[in-house]
UniProtKB/Swiss-Prot annotation:
Keyword annotations: Cell inner membrane, Cell membrane, Membrane, Transmembrane, Transmembrane helix, Transport
A single cellular component GO annotation: plasma membrane
Location within or outside the cell: Cell inner membrane
Keyword Chaperone: no
Recorded coiled-coil stretches: none
SUPFAM superfamilies: MFS general substrate transporter
Membrane topology summary: Multi-pass membrane protein
Name of this chain's protein: Putative transporter AmpG 2
UniProt source species: Rickettsia prowazekii (strain Madrid E)
Gene of this entry: ampG2
Length: 408
């Protein structure tokens, strides 16, 4: 009887993670890819649009407030403290999205950018809380599945704020589109408020020494420098591409309606499918083997951009190219994020997850911010060739990753 109860509890926790990941994905695109379409229609050039990626630079520093979150979340309030953090953070995200709609990027440039930065700040906190919830609620043998669920929820959010927002923008203004996205976050907020959280382990009260202990615990792991370098470079290809595929598809003649269905909606389904397959593969294959294989598959997907550019630009070709790109992207995510969790200790989960994702975001944000320059001066063909070669540094580092990691 206890076994059946534990099994149902695990399933409900995984579903909870899926649903609370939805606003994270939805908000993610509102400061990224979807924003680029709004800026493009406001007559900003590729270089400026690429530089807008720097509003997410604050994600790099989220490891600094990770210990503070642990202090608040894992105090004597325990489960309630963690829930309060989730609720307050999501409310602030919704509020910032709504305030953003009060500004025009052309006439209110500085307030517009500042509001985006504040939104990115609260979004980074929410992402930390989502990721750490997997470690706190899910047993380690189910991390691959929980990450697939988290990726699925995140990607559904991206689907709504990507395909849905793009389609809505053909009917209503971008300001109204963003207001609609803010409203769609409310059901997840209500679930967080009413869902009974219960951690799998007893959480130890925090003190300031844990700030340093969390970093020391991570640094003393075998081959720490290799792990950090790997985290920094694994998603180099996606970082280099950044939001430029949006501009590419528009430049070669596809309409927003084509992209809403063929790129955003279909592409998101392909990414989710890839994420689910990747999650189950995590249970079957050893990490280094799987990470190498999916990295190569994703690198080869860059050929689909070149195919579209030189050979064929019809709707069928768009679907084929998008499937190659997005399925392999999803395939890389589950093993990568599961490996991130494996590198963390449960007693310092928020701080260490924040540290790891901050390292990952350094490459994503800094490299992504120059993608506009690269696309402008290299041209589309050479731009995608360089993107395809970006897998090489991470592939080499995988060969030197430690075989075992202490994540207690």
């Amino acid at each position: 009887m206890n076994f059946k109860f534990a099994r149902f509890k695990s399933i409900f926790n995984i579903l909870f993670i899926l649903i609370i990941a939805f606003p994270g994905g939805l908000i993610y695109l509102l400061t990224g890819s979807t924003l680029s379409f709004w800026l493009r229609e406001s007559d900003f050039d590729k270089i400026t649009i690429g530089l807008f990626g720097l509003v997410n630079f604050i994600h790099i520093f989220k490891f600094l407030w990770g210990p503070l979150l642990e202090k608040i979340s894992f105090s004597t309030l325990s489960n309630r403290g963690y829930k309060y953090c989730l609720v307050i953070t999501l409310i602030n995200c919704i509020f910032c999205v709504y305030v953003l709609t009060s500004f025009n990027p052309n006439t209110n440039f500085i307030p517009f950018v500042l509001c985006l930065v504040v939104l990115a700040f609260f979004s980074s906190i929410y992402d930390m809380l989502i990721q750490s919830s997997q470690m706190l609620l899910i047993t380690d043998k189910n991390w691959g599945i929980s990450e697939a669920a988290c990726t699925t929820g995140f990607r559904i959010g991206i689907l709504i704020s990507g395909s849905g927002a793009l389609y809505l923008s053909t009917i209503i203004s971008w300001q109204d589109v963003y207001r609609t996205m803010a409203i769609l976050c409310i059901p997840s907020l209500l679930l967080i408020i009413f869902y009974p959280l219960k951690f799998k382990d007893k959480i130890i009260d925090n003190d300031f020494d844990r700030f340093l202990n969390a970093f020391y615990d991570f640094i003393k792991k075998p081959k720490c420098i290799v792990i950090i370098s790997f985290m920094l470079l694994y998603r180099l290809q996606d970082s280099f591409l950044s939001i430029m595929p949006n501009m590419f598809y528009l430049d070669i003649g596809y309409t927003k309606q084509d992209l809403a269905v063929g790129y955003k909606a279909f592409g998101m389904c392909a990414t989710i499918f890839g994420g689910v397959i990747g999650g189950f593969l995590c249970r079957k294959y050893e990490y280094s083997y799987l990470l190498k294989r999916v990295l190569i598959y994703h690198a080869l997907s860059s050929l689909s951009f070149i195919y579209l550019y030189f050979l064929n630009q019809d709707i069928t070709s768009l679907y084929i190219a998008v499937f190659c790109q997005e399925f392999t992207k999803g395939l890389t995510m589950s093993p990568f994020f599961s490996y991130q969790l494996k590198c963390c200790s449960s007693r310092y989960c928020i701080t260490q997850i924040a540290l790891i994702t901050s390292i990952t975001n350094v490459g994503t944000i800094l490299i992504g911010s120059i993608s506009g320059y690269a696309a402008t001066y290299l041209g589309w063909s050479y731009f995608f060739i360089v993107a395809g070669l970006c897998f090489i540094p991470a592939y080499i580092l995988i060969l030197y990753l430690p075989k075992t990691i202490n994540s207690v």
